[in-house]
């Protein structure tokens, strides 16, 4: 799957969890999920579960610790889905 397609799906999955809709409108790979989009850290588990379902992958807890930006998500998902 192309990086752009993964990026678009990641943003779509994050959309309902993002409290800052203005930041969501100008999202990029460097956008911080917790700080800029204001996704509640407790909801990050739900986001990861949706990533796993959408892309047919498994994401380990250690991998989740390395996710802070949308680009981190795209890179991790691309690696796992390859």
Task: Pin down the residues of each PLM region.
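C-terminal structural segments of small proteins and small subunits
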Residues: 71-80
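Conserved alpha-helix in the HATPase_c
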Residues: 46
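Thiotemplate assembly-line natural product biosynthesis machinery
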Residues: 1-23
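Two-component histidine kinase catalytic core, primarily the HATPase_c
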Residues: 43
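Phosphopantetheine carrier-protein modules
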Residues: 18-38, 58-68
């Amino acid at each position: 799957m192309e990086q752009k397609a993964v990026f678009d799906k990641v943003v779509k999955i994050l959309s309902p969890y993002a409290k800052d809709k203005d930041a969501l409108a100008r999202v990029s790979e460097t956008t911080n999920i917790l700080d800029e989009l204001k996704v509640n850290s407790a909801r990050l588990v739900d986001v990861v579960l949706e990533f796993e379902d959408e892309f047919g992958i498994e994401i380990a807890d250690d991998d989740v610790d390395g996710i802070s930006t949308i680009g981190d998500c795209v890179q991790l998902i691309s690696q796992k889905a390859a």
